Amino acid sequence: SYDSLTVVFGIASDKDIPGSLRPLAQAADKVIFTRATGNARAARPGELARTFHEISGKHAMTCPDLADAMELAVRGTNREDVICVTGSFYL
């Protein structure tokens, strides 16, 4: 078991973004949106955060790349928390 679930999420812009974000709204305590560096198809983190807010009413954090997102996730968790990195496997 764990205390808190932080999700680091990135996805290609041509995927079913709303369908992918709905489960996050139910399961995650914190969400950090990011994108794969050098992938032209990657959805922009700010757009993902806006769509997530429209779907869930919840706010999320954004980072320009995976390294920054992971640093933010690690800083915001403790030993009883879980970090899940998911989305398109370009990350």
Where would I find each of the regions flagged by the language model?
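Short secondary-structure boundary segments
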Residues: I11, R35-A36, F89
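C-terminal helical cap/extension that packs against the catalytic core
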Residues: P18-V82
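Residue-level signal for inorganic ion chemistry
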Residues: V7, V31, V85-S88
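Short phosphate-engaging motifs
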Residues: D16, L91
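Helix N-cap/beta->alpha junction signal
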Residues: L66, S88-F89
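Metal-dependent phosphodiesterase/nuclease catalytic metal-binding core
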Residues: S1-I11, I17-L21
